[in-house]
Amino acid sequence: YDCTLSFEGHINNSDVSYNLSKTNDILLSGFNLIGNPFAHDIYKGEGAAIDNDDLAEGYYILSNSGAWSAKISDGTAIKPCQSILVKTVKAGELKIKKTNSSPSRKSRDNESLEIKVSNSNYEDVAYVSFDNKVGLEKIEHKNVNVPMIYIPVEDKDFAIAMLEESTKDIPVSFEAKTMGEYTLSVSALNDRFDNIYLVDKLTGDFANMLLE
């Protein structure tokens, strides 16, 4: 099916502001859906169009498979007309600057881990960053068949968890939504880890994920 889309109006040539809401005392408060209002790519992160001030690290995009896929604030472009789901720590105005500059400080500058689970149809990912920023809480996928992997910390589940540098043990939770075989993989985003061991709490088996 081919079609031609036309947009009427004026191209934004200056900064654009959104009002972000946050309702206290409800589950997963502070999530807001915002879009790229410009005709060029933008980025989220320090020094980029969407700064991390008052926002949790990273954001979500809705994939074609119906998964809310977490993205860390790095060199991943937000395309024109693309929407992302961000979490704010307080209600207020968010200014999106008219710039296509990439973040001045990227996730790979820190010690970070990417933990991925996949089957033959879907995949999900969680991140661990040893930093003092605000983590991104895990949300349910639109597609109930997509598996979920997340990091539980202090009674909350995170897609992007922020932990102390001294942390040695990281809890990882996984939910298989359908029967089948799943693959779990771990990647060090900056190659600063010599060994990363996955311990099966049920069997006691462990494996060095950097060698598997």
Regions found by a protein language model. Name each.
Residues 2-212:
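Compositionally biased Ser/Thr/Gly- and acidic/asparagine-rich
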